Amino acid sequence: MPTESLQTGSMVKPVSPAGTFTSAVPLRILNKGPDYFRRQAEPNPKRLSAVERLEADKAKYVKSQEVINAKQEPVKPAVLAKPPVCPAAKRALGSPTLKGFGGGGGGAKSEGGAPRETLKLEILKNILNSSEGSSTGSGHKHSARNWPAPRADAAELHRHSFAESLRARPAPGRGSPQEGGSHVGRRPPEPTSSAAAAADAFLHVSHSSSDIRQGPGARPLKAILPCSSSAPPLPPKPKVAAPAAVKSPEAEAAEPAGGVGRRPSLQRSKSDLSDRYFRVDADVERFFNYCGLDPEELENLGMENFARANSDIISLNFRSASMISSDCEQSQDSNSDLRNDDSANDRVPYGISAIERNARIIKWLYSIKQARESQKVSHV
C-alpha cells in the first residue's frame, strides 16, 4: 500500500453515535422544535368549499354592490319532522304513570332534555302499538266522544245518490222539496243547521234495491217504488227525431242546386256532344280530308280522287260521335239501374279501331301520291 493512504487512514477519528445522529438530521428541522411534529400528526385543516371560495372572490366578477354584500348561506340538511301526536297519545302523556316517571327522573332533566324526549317517544310508541292491538269498548266510546264525526266518502255519497234515485218523482204541479234529489248522480245539497243531525246518519243499502234500511235518527223515505224490480228505474229517453227524416225548407232548396253543380257532365245532350266532337280545327280537317292541299291543287288533281277517302273519314267521325254519346247514355243507365250493365257487356262495340283508321289514312295518302305521279306523267 502507498504511504499516503496509510497517513489519511490514521488521521480519521472515530465517530461517536451522537455525532452520527446530528449529521443525519438537518439542522433546520432541529431548530423548529416539537410543535412542528405535532402539526404534522394532526389531520389536514378543512379545505374551503367552492361556495366559500366564490364568496371570497366575488368582487372580481360581480359589479353590483348589493350582490357583493349579500352572503350565500350553505345548504343545510333537511331536519326530520316529528310525527304528529294523536289525542290518545296526549292523554297518555298526562297519565299518572308518565307523571311519576317525569318526577322520578329529575337527574335526567338536569343532564339535558334530549334523553328524556327519546324515552318519552319510545314509551309513546309502545302505548300506540298496544292500543292498536287491543280493542276495548271503553276506548271506542272515549275516542268517539273526542273525535268529530267522519265525513262521508265517495262510496257513501254514491249510496246516498242511489237511494235518492229510488224515491218517487213528484208531480210537476206540486212544489215538493225532493225535486233536487230525484235525478240519479246529482250530488245532494249541503245540510243546513236544522238538518245536521239527520245528515250524520247514512243510508245502508244492500245489494238489492228492495232491502233499504235507515240509520237511527234519519227521516223516513216518503215514497218507495214497488219491490218487483231488482234494478233502479231508468229515466225515459228523450225522443230525438232522425236528422234525415226532418228537413228544413232551406236544405230542400239547397239540394237541387248542389246536385246540379256536382254532376254537370251528365246533363249534356246528344247535340252538345256532336258539336263538341265536330269542332275540329280547319288545318286538321284539311290534312285528314284533303292531305293539306290547297283548293287550287285539289281542282287540278280532281275531287273524284278524294271522294272515297272523304266519305270514309266523315262516316268514321259520325260513327265515333254517335258511339261516344251512346256510351254516355249507357253510363247514365248503369248508374240508375244495375241490370243495364249486363246488356252493355253483351253489346258488341263498334268494329273500327285506331289501327284500322290509320291504315285507311295511309292507303288514302298513297292513292293521292299515285294520282299526282300519273298527272305529271300525262303532262309530260
Curated annotation (Swiss-Prot):
Residues modified as Phosphoserine: S248, S311
Biased composition, class Polar residues, residue ranges: 127-138
Positions of the UniProt region annotated as Disordered: 92-272, 327-347
Keywords carried by this UniProt record: Cytoplasm, Cytoskeleton, Phosphoprotein
UniProt keyword Phosphoprotein, yes or no: yes
Residue spans of biased composition, Gly residues class: 100-110
Listed Low complexity bias regions: 239-248
Subcellular location: Cytoplasm; Cytoplasm, Cytoskeleton, Microtubule organizing center, Centrosome
GO cellular component: centrosome; cytoplasm
Primary site of residence: cytoplasm
Compositionally biased intervals (Basic and acidic residues): 153-162, 336-345
Statement: the UniProt record of this protein carries the keyword Cytoplasm: yes
One Pfam entry name: FAM110_N
Family, per entry: Belongs to the FAM110 family.
Protein known as: Protein FAM110B
